[in-house]
Regions:
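A short mid-domain helix/strand-loop element embedded in enzyme catalytic domains
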Residues: 129-137, 142-145, 152-161
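A feature for the membrane-embedded catalytic helix bundles of lipid/isoprenoid biosynthetic enzymes
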Residues: 41-47, 51-140, 209-351
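Short beta-strand-to-loop acidic/aromatic patch adjacent to the donor-nucleotide binding site
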Residues: 4-17
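Conserved donor-nucleotide/metal-binding helix-loop-beta segment in metal-dependent transferases, i.e.
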Residues: 19-41, 224
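Short amphipathic alpha-helical coupling elements at transmembrane boundaries
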Residues: 137-145, 191, 195, 205, ...
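Short acidic, S/G/P-rich loop/turn micro-motifs used as interaction or catalytic elements
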Residues: 15-25, 52-56
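Membrane-embedded alpha-helical segments that form the functional core of polytopic membrane enzymes
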Residues: 150-203
Length: 351
């Protein structure tokens, strides 16, 4: 601090895990700020301080003590969370800033689980939010320890994605659907692994999201070809052509909505978040189709999936018309969670 010669300094403890957004927030403040977290042995703090001796208590044994001293002397203010921009567009959710002290292995494991849970998207499908997390967690933890790069997981997922298509077309449903579910789970694993290990890359994002956009209609064509026995004039294959058009139209609507509001159509309002749980997307359609195949209703399920895609696109069309030219800040209010805190609180007991 003394070497800073009056320049601002952000003080961190080596035994803490800090939210990168909090560091950026502190760096943009103009005065001394402190941020506290935890209780008892896990109480910790980070301090944004000017590099001058009058504001620095050299007798402080740790940053929490220093922060307390600065507050008592009026030399700093606590971080005002109303000024903190907690919305994460990529995750479609609000996360409060976090700061944790790693006191032992138990605390480390709790923090790791918190980071895992807080990296789930706020608006996503039922399978991703309720079915896959236990399996994804059991995969992400050892992969992180083994330092497996998330791009490796992404590439394995891509191989599974397109290897499933000829199996679908041949009516080899068991191996095809096995590969499909492997890809579906790995699609959650690579993103969580990248964010937890801070190894996200533009190339990985491109491969991951590019595959997500391209492969669903290819799968649907494969399903229809397998159901029809290779008859391009069959009703089910003709329905797959309609599915392609509706799918592309729906994706265009999602992009238009983001252009006109600055937000994802999937989390603009609470109703959008709820509907995203069951709207027509790959994971939901995959689960429905597999169950239908098991009871001999593959054709009926496929027609239902096409109809559900059409209803999803219609709802998105209504939302685009409804909010076209609207205020980009509209709908940004923080959603309250049951305990009265802001969604994404860093209280570990919530996870």
């Amino acid at each position: 601090v003394e070497d800073a010669k009056g320049d601002p300094v952000i003080c961190l403890s080596a035994d803490t895990e800090i939210d990168g957004r909090l560091v950026i927030h502190l760096a943009t403040r103009q005065d001394n700020r402190v941020f506290f977290s935890g209780e008892g042995d896990e109480r910790c703090a980070t301090v944004r301080i000017r590099g001058d001796v009058p504001d620095f208590d050299e007798s402080a044994g740790d940053l929490a003590t220093l922060a307390d001293s600065m507050l008592r002397r009026g030399a700093a203010q606590e971080v005002d969370l109303t000024e903190f921009k907690g919305y994460i567009a990529k995750l479609r959710r609000y996360n409060a800033p976090y700061l944790f002290k790693l006191t032992n292995e138990e605390a480390r494991d709790r923090i790791a689980r918190f980071l895992f849970d807080s990296n789930y998207k706020g608006a996503t499908d039922f399978m991703t939010s309720h079915v896959y997390p236990p399996l994804v967690w059991r995969m992400v933890k050892p992969l992180a320890q083994w330092r497996v790069h998330p791009n490796v997981v992404t590439i394995i997922g891509i191989i599974a994605t397109f290897s499933a298509v000829p199996l679908f077309a041949a009516g080899a449903w068991i191996p095809g659907m096995t590969l499909a579910f492997i890809m579906s789970v790995l699609d959650s694993v690579d993103g969580k692994l990248a964010r937890l290990t801070y190894t996200s890359t533009p190339q990985g994002d491109f491969l991951d999201h590019g595959t997500d956009y391209i492969h669903p209609p290819i799968w649907y064509f494969g399903w229809a070809w397998g159901l029809s026995g290779g008859d391009p004039y069959s009703g089910v294959f003709q329905a797959s052509i309609w599915m392609m058009g509706i799918y592309v139209f729906d994706r265009i609507l999602e992009r238009l909505f983001k252009i006109c509001t600055g937000r994802s159509i999937q989390d603009f309002r609470p109703i959008d978040v709820k509907l995203r749980t069951f709207t027509s997307r790959r994971n939901i359609n995959l689960a429905v189709f597999v169950v239908a195949l098991m009871v001999g209703l593959g054709h009926e399920a496929f027609y239902a999936i096409v109809g559900w895609q059409a209803l999803t696109a219609f709802y998105h069309f209504v939302r685009v018309v409804q909010f076209w030219g609207g205020d980009p800040e509209e709908g940004l209010e923080k959603r309250q969670v049951p305990d009265g805190g802001i969604e994404g609180s860093n209280n570990l007991s919530n996870f």
